[in-house]
């Protein structure tokens, strides 16, 4: 019974740690800056009695549209990366299996197996690294090309053509994956989006004060025939302004994490180790 309790506590602790990691993965220094700006903006609005019924459509265009656009683009890049990596791995596996059933010597079959592993290993190293040096990757791909040229005599004419097509798919998959790593979503849109997220609390605080009531006047709730009840909405205004800013900057952080789906920064990044596994 004691062991069962210990197992339960360990499982509960692991679950809580995973949940904590899950919900804090999008938090960084921008989150703190955004929260501080929200508090300052709300304090400023109360300090100078700023209370306006402002139209939020303008700020929606400035913040929500570019945020949704860049977030959608980042997820599309991730899906494309999965597609290109899958194509490259599948084509490499097909090349290896074609030679494994050919009349090539066992030594050559072992060599193509090692070269396929080398290409996958070098591709993963390159995508994970911050460097743009792909010389080792290019050499490993060239080795497979040279191997095919050297051993095509063991394949029929039609099979040789198919192998070269598979090699083309390998190169296309690798190059497209490299392009996704090097080229990001439009940086100007992301820069303006971040700027407007920081400006938004100064625009939103006076609107909240106008809609929820000034601290000096109170906010009417539960009005009945017998009378009304009032309470101070200062805390509510502060909380709502912080919450909306927190949501916006968290979405921005998520977009930044999946901007490069290969760097391992974020829960939604591609697990490249899976592409090194053999069928």
Residue ranges of model-derived segments:
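Intrinsic-disorder-associated, low-complexity terminal segments enriched in Asp/Asn/His/Tyr and depleted
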Residues: 3-5
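N-terminal juxtamembrane/topogenic regions of multi-pass membrane proteins
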Residues: 9-86, 217, 229-234, 249-279
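N-terminal pre-first-transmembrane
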Residues: 87-90, 94-97
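Structured inter-helical modules in multipass membrane proteins
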Residues: 95-193
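Alpha-helical transmembrane segments
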Residues: 180-186, 213, 254-262
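Bilayer-spanning, highly hydrophobic alpha-helical transmembrane segments
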Residues: 191-212, 235-250
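Membrane-interfacial helix-loop-helix connectors in multipass membrane proteins
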Residues: 209-236
């Amino acid at each position: 019974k004691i062991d069962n309790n210990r197992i339960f506590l360990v499982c509960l602790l692991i679950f809580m740690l995973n949940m904590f990691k899950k919900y804090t993965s999008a938090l960084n220094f921008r989150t703190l800056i955004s929260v501080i700006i929200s508090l300052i903006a709300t304090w400023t609005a109360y300090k100078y009695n700023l209370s306006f019924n402002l139209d939020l459509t303008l700020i929606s265009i400035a913040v929500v549209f570019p945020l949704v656009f860049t977030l959608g683009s980042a997820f599309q890049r991730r899906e494309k990366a999965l597609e290109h990596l899958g194509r490259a791995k599948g084509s490499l596996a097909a090349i290896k299996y074609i030679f494994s059933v050919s009349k090539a010597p066992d030594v050559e079959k072992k060599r193509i197996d090692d070269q396929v592993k080398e290409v996958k290993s070098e591709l993963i190293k390159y995508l994970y690294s911050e460097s743009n040096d792909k010389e080792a990757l290019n050499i490993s791909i060239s080795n497979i090309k040279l191997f095919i040229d050297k051993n095509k005599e063991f394949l029929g004419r039609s099979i040789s053509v198919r192998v070269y097509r598979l090699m083309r798919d390998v190169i296309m998959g690798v190059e497209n994956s490299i392009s996704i790593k090097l080229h990001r979503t439009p940086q100007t849109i992301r820069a303006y989006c971040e700027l407007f997220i920081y400006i938004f609390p100064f625009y939103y605080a006076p609107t909240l004060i106008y809609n929820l009531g000034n601290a000096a006047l109170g906010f009417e709730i539960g009005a009945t025939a017998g009378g009304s009840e009032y309470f101070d909405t200062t805390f509510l205004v502060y909380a709502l302004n912080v919450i909306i800013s927190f949501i916006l900057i968290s979405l921005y952080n998520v977009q930044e994490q999946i901007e490069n789906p290969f760097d391992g920064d974020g829960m939604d990044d591609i697990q490249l180790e899976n592409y090194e596994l053999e069928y």
